[in-house]
């Protein structure tokens, strides 16, 4: 048998997309935020797709990793199945919390949720795997008993030291 043939050099199959420039903007109450499907972003087609969905101007807050995030000015309509598959979560920011997310601070997050009539809060932020299920369970128990009518998710601001509570559309 002959030794394997090794070809060096050449171009990568797909050039990395350079137009997903992350910008630091401080999110504010009333802004919209969406977590985009990571595979769509990795494919390099995210910006082309975002231009077709009528969300107005948008800014990449995080374009890498498991939770690519954009801030945008208009609500995203997710009733179409194609849309729902490409947007993991979308909502309007109702509160920014300047605290670490720990078991000790969970009550502060719950109180803020109650002020906004939130009955379910899903954590969509990277946390220590040992504490995440405990925190999620604490949120579920405390909020379910209070009968809030809205669903929300919790994100960590990728460029800041705060958490965003976002009410789902």
Predicted regions located by residue number:
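Class I S-adenosyl-L-methionine
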Residues: 1-169
